[in-house]
Amino acid sequence: MPEGVNKARAMFAESIDDDAVPQMLRPALHTLLQEIDDLEVKVDAVEHQLAGFAKQSPSAKRLMGIPGNGLLTATAMLASAGKASYFRSGHHLASWIGLTPREHSSGSRGTLGGISKRGDPYLRMLLVHGARPLLRAANQRVKSDRPLDTLQRWALQLQERTTHNKAACAIADKMARIAWACW
């Protein structure tokens, strides 16, 4: 099954016209194609409502100004986390989302593991997916000899020390901390 509305629509349109598809199945394919169109209209309506909310909300405007954050990330953060005052610091917000390393301690020894993955998985996914283009843009700026800002420089230094995905999670963690400060 293809991912994406346009690919699914094209696949169903081809299947309807295909002689190998039984005649009994074609009305069901028409119904599925209509459901895809209806869902796309509903998604557009929800995105329009979110855009209207973001225009009126000063917090959403500030959150959307953070590199890597867009309409969905800003509104999901406001809906999920509520107010910044619920958290003592940016670290607590990032920890609540599940972006901080899991700590294992025994006696005087402490080790850090992978991210804890606690909290809202949708918000965490949006932040990590927002961090990936930020990292890619930093790499492209280096290739074209353009200057880097502080966050991009830090992201590239981090990527040199670890894998791309770990760097994206660490950037998402930093984005959550920046969001708390801007909120």
Show where each model-derived region lies.
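A detector of single, family-specific signature residues
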Residues: 1-183
